[in-house]
Amino acid sequence: MKILFIISGSIAIKKCGEIFEFLSSKNISIDCIVTKNAKKMINLKKLKKTISGKIYSDVDEKNNKMLHIDLTRKNNLVIVCPATSNIIAKYSNGIADDLASTTLMASNKNIFFIPAMNSEMWNNKINQKNVSNLKNLGIQFIGPEYGKLSCGEVGLGRLMNTRTITNLIIQNVNKTQIFKDKKCL
């Protein structure tokens, strides 16, 4: 099983390592796309140690114009974690202006968004409309949850507990594996 993670620029990025380590221990191969803003917040050397696949960014697409297509074809599942209001809005509105958003637009695989943002951003009417649009299209959301946010405030917007995230991903992987190599009429 191969999963493509799209990492966007949220402070919750620090929890991705736990998720990757657990999934890697279950022999799940992970590739990552790191957005421009995420690159400012994450240690790429540490990230590389927690995944078995490759790390991609906008720079890589300059050498391979089909990279967004190739990534969706070789992975079984696409997960955006942490998902910011920016990447949610881009996908909801069909904006494809970087590797992360063009890959989402090119994907025909199951897509999960795992949001993390301040409550004010999560509850914003435009953000909620975008989330609703995506859910109506069959995009799945894991979280967010209510609790203490990175900024110190308490509210809805915190990244879901990493154990819950990994359990839900494993459940989806198991569902996908049931139908692997099967032909349905």
Give residue spans per PLM region.
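A cross-family phosphate/adenosyl-ligand binding-site feature
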Residues: 1-112, 118-181
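N-terminal nucleotide-binding beta1-loop-alpha1 segment
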Residues: 184-185
